[in-house]
């Protein structure tokens, strides 16, 4: 009941006359300390009238407001955007949560007052996107109350049954299930509208809010009424992909509108529930949970039994289309192989600047795989790393810094990767090394950034002797500061000579070592 009291002994009770929602209470250094869910850490003391009073300002850490990490993406301006409410079969009834990390500072979108304005509970925000034409303008999808609109993090509108074509599956305005928000290249906002209740169901499962404010409703019988149309994406060809994650009606849907949004007569569309793999085996995936496209145009899909890859997604509409399950050799002399992560439920897949795959599992932590998926570069778990939990819910990678944000069931962590998005060309001001100079007490790696894909790197001393060489991972290269004999290099100036894979373009920079 948002109250706090203190027993001095079995017969004496002191009540705190403040409305605090506390989750932790202790005594230290002459203060009673209350950990409050919304107000941070607060110090309290008894006054002269033996009444407990708040005596310190609220201490709120620079951190996420809640440990809800079901959806994450990186905005165009480099900020991290998080939506805190997902669906696991059905809605979770989590308080509406949208958080942003900008310049190492956390902030949250408005929550208070939304219920009073809409007449509906504000909860289960499962997806949020930034308007590509206005960085202060956002839309957020909910698992039951439709679509919310924000400006400068403040609520401005709700779209539901009564003011838009959004549909409910059962006649109630708390069953308007929206998800999968994505903008296309023409700044039209796409979304899924899913749900069914016994015989009723949503008839038009894809909705589009055009840049001019006009709505379009698209009807495709193969996905109409499905319960959980969740993650979506546009591929390099402009096709729209949707996954259905509900275990009873899971599958993957692909749509090619031929560029005519308001004329569906020429559309190509197809829904596949159970894929056939390269061996002709029909797979039972036990659910489909995430989808992404890699640098080569292959589509990686996370299922309940490992990842599958669509190496030729342009053939998706053909009758003989098949997926690929990666076979990892056992290397035990038997010539046998195992399907990649076939025993793991895959909740999240992200592709870094080096086309490597970060794969988040339900119970086994996160894997970093080589571009082809055959090599495990890292396998981080709660037991061998700072991961807070082995249940990975979401992954987002900052394209310019390579920082990998990992949302777990117990909170958010990040890992500084050695891969960034590659540049199209070498630009003198963008190619540099850091830290520079390298001071005596520094023992970490030196990073060269601003590179193109597969840059050939040679590091020499002033006399031209080769000290180290290698190839960039995406747009970045890291060096441990050691020579080819494994010894730390002495003081001096070292030249970094960079060339593209064809050897037709090059650039140089310098690193100063102080020992």
PLM regions: where:
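Carboxylate-rich, polar loop motifs that coordinate divalent cations or form catalytic acidic clusters
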Residues: 1-430, 466
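Surface-exposed loops/turns
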Residues: 389, 440, 453, 485, ...
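Short, conserved beta-strand segments of beta-strand-rich sandwich/propeller modules, principally
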Residues: 401-403, 490-495
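C-terminal tail/sorting-segment detector
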Residues: 495-515
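A short acidic/small-residue loop/turn micro-motif
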Residues: 395, 472-476, 513
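Short, glycine-anchored, charge-dense loop/turn motifs used at functional sites
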Residues: 456-467, 494, 503
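Glycine-centered tight-turn motifs at strand-turn-strand junctions
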Residues: 466-489, 500-504
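Glycine-centered coil/turn sites that cap beta-strands in beta-rich domains
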Residues: 425-458, 476-479
């Amino acid at each position: 009941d948002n109250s706090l009291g203190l027993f001095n002994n079995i017969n004496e009770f002191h009540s705190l006359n403040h409305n605090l929602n506390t989750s932790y209470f202790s005594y230290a250094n002459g203060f009673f300390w209350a950990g409050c869910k919304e107000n941070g850490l607060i110090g309290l003391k008894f006054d002269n009238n033996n009444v407990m009073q708040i005596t310190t300002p609220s201490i709120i850490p620079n951190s996420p407001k809640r440990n809800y990490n079901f959806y994450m993406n990186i905005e165009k301006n480099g900020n991290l955007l998080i939506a805190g409410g997902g669906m696991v079969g059905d809605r979770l009834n989590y308080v509406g949560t949208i958080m942003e990390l900008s310049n190492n500072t956390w902030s949250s979108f408005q929550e208070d007052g939304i219920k009073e304005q809409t007449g509906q509970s504000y909860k289960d925000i499962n997806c949020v996107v930034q308007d590509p034409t206005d960085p202060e303008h956002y839309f957020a999808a909910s698992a039951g109350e439709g679509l919310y609109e924000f400006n400068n993090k403040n609520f401005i509108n709700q779209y539901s049954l009564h003011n838009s074509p959004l549909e409910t599956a059962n006649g109630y305005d708390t069953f308007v299930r929206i998800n999968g928000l994505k903008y296309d290249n023409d700044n039209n906002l796409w979304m899924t509208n899913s749900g069914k209740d016994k015989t009723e169901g949503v008839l038009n499962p894809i909705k589009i809010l055009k840049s001019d404010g006009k709505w379009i409703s698209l009807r495709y019988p193969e996905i109409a009424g499905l319960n959980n149309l969740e993650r979506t994406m546009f591929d390099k060809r402009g096709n729209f992909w949707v996954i259905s994650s509900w275990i009873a009606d899971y599958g993957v849907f692909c749509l090619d509108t031929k560029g005519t949004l308001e004329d569906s007569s020429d559309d190509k569309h197809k829904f596949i529930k159970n894929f056939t793999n390269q061996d002709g085996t029909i797979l039972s995936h036990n659910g489909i949970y995430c989808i992404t496209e890699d640098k080569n145009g292959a589509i990686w899909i996370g299922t309940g039994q490992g990842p599958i890859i669509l190496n030729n997604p342009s053939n998706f509409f053909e009758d003989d289309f098949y997926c690929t399950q990666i076979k990892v050799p056992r290397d035990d002399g038997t010539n046998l192989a195992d399907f990649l992560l076939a025993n793991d439920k895959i909740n999240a897949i992200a592709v870094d600047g080096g086309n490597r795959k970060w794969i988040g599992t339900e119970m086994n932590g996160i894997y970093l795989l080589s571009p082809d998926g055959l090599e495990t570069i890292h396998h981080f778990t709660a037991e061998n790393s700072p991961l807070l939990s082995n249940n990975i819910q979401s992954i987002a990678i900052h394209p310019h810094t390579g920082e990998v944000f990992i949302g777990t069931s117990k909170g958010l962590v990040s890992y500084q990767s050695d891969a960034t998005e590659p540049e199209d060309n070498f630009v003198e001001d963008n190619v540099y090394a850091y830290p520079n100079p390298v001071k005596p007490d520094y023992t970490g790696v030196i990073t060269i950034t601003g590179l193109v894909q597969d840059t050939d790197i040679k590091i020499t001393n002033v006399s031209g002797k080769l000290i180290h060489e290698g190839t960039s991972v995406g747009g970045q290269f890291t060096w441990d500061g050691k020579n080819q004999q494994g010894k730390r290099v002495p003081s001096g100036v070292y030249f970094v000579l960079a060339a593209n894979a064809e050897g037709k373009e090059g650039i140089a920079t310098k690193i100063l070592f102080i020992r």
